Amino acid sequence: MNRDVAIAELAARAEGLRARGIAAAYLFGSTARGEARADSDLDVFVDIEPNTRFSLFDLIGVKHFLEDELGREVDLTTRGGLHPLLRDEIEREAVRIL
């Protein structure tokens, strides 16, 4: 999936993401850089709506929602789950979807 298609497909799921407690979603990695192969997964990190109870089970639910909707593997994490040594670089290259 190329960058523009991935952005459009993720943006089209904004309502479903918001309904699941997501305040913001960002595409990063090879797809965001325009370097994805046909079989590449989508790397996404999210910010959770403030004052929302959100667990690991909720995060897994969002991952499954996106994978079912997009028909592609999604590597999903929260902003806080980004590796501290890579976080600045990931945030610089990330494309905000929601």
Which sequence ranges carry the predicted segments?
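Catalytic core of pol beta-like nucleotidyltransferases
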Residues: 1-24, 33-38, 49-98
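Conserved histidines in hydrophobic membrane contexts and catalytic metal-binding motifs
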Residues: 27
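A short, structured beta-strand/loop element
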Residues: 38-40, 44
